[in-house]
Amino acid sequence: IYLTIMKKIANTKKNNIFKKIFIKFCRLIGFEIIDQSSLSSPSLNKNMNETLTIQGKKSITIPLGQVDITKKIISLKIILRTCTSELIMDQNKKRILELEKNEYTFRTLRSLIKSTRIASEKFKNINFEIIVTDTNSHKEDLEKLNEILSKCKIKNKLILVDLNNFKSKIKGDYSTAKFSNMANFYNSLLLAKNEDADMIYFVEDDYLHTKNSITEMILSYEKFYSIFSKDLILLPSDYPYLYSKDENTKIYLGEKYHWRLVSESLVTFMTSKILINKHFDKLEKMGLEWVDPWERPLHELYKSHPCLSPMPSLAVHFANINSIFGISPFINIQKLWDENENL
């Protein structure tokens, strides 16, 4: 019995040595191993419930295997457009929870900071920056925005948009709220064009983000670019109106979420600076003149570049409860709201 046990131990040691050598060899040649008996990846030293993807190198989805990444994200600028003086532009409606507009703005910023902070801890080689561009917010609200930003370890800045710079550019007679909205978006486009970044995320100030939103968008963008071999657009929200039309679509696997191909959106989206510069003249139309639907230039862009929306939502648009452009399905709205009361 003793000899039998010793032989088993010796064989186990030999197997372990062989296993270690094999794992090292796989690492050298870039192969990953999945051990289905332990639900782990010995070559990555991770279990299967963890993120197996290596940012900028390979996207790994079990059981489909890996996608070699052909576009590595190195910098992301998040441009948050704020205005606390208007509850809902040109509408006499209240938002869900029926609070003042500034509270939605503050919680949007906090949620972005939290999500970006988590992403920055995962992706040490990506440069992040949060830029807040504001029009017509009250002095007290601007002070609060600065206070929130002061607690943010991510590089950031607050820019007050001078509306006078756009009076000669924007065509038509618009309400103060609509003019400010157009000017703020136009200013964001100019920032995106001139800033040193390869990825830009345009955000409106009533989208509360989940903690994993920025991480999922970064890894999914790299994966989808590598699949489509072209720049694309990612939305953070699973809009209700997407379910009101009987349209054919396609579903793709991102990092941890399903993503669906869509043909329409609002004006919160992430894309590359290359795409913005290439189609700047088309996007600029949204800042020069309001033609319904205002997002039409974006919709035209989606005919040549894929636009994808997550399922379930990574961010929720806190609009009126009856708006088909608002609350995403199957999300705990109250929990998301409460989580962003503070940083």
Role assignments for model-derived ranges:
Residues 1-61:
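Membrane-proximal basic amphipathic "stem/tether" segments
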Residues 124-137, 161-163:
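Short beta-strand/loop segment that forms part of the nucleotide-sugar
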Residues 192, 199, 210-283:
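Conserved catalytic core of nucleotide-sugar-dependent glycosyltransferases
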Residues 138-197:
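Active-site-proximal specificity loops/subdomain of glycosyltransferases
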Residues 273-343:
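C-terminal catalytic/acceptor-binding lobe
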Residues 205-208:
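The conserved acidic donor/metal-binding loop of glycosyltransferases
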Residues 96-104, 108-125:
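Short, acidic, metal-binding catalytic loop of nucleotide-sugar glycosyltransferases
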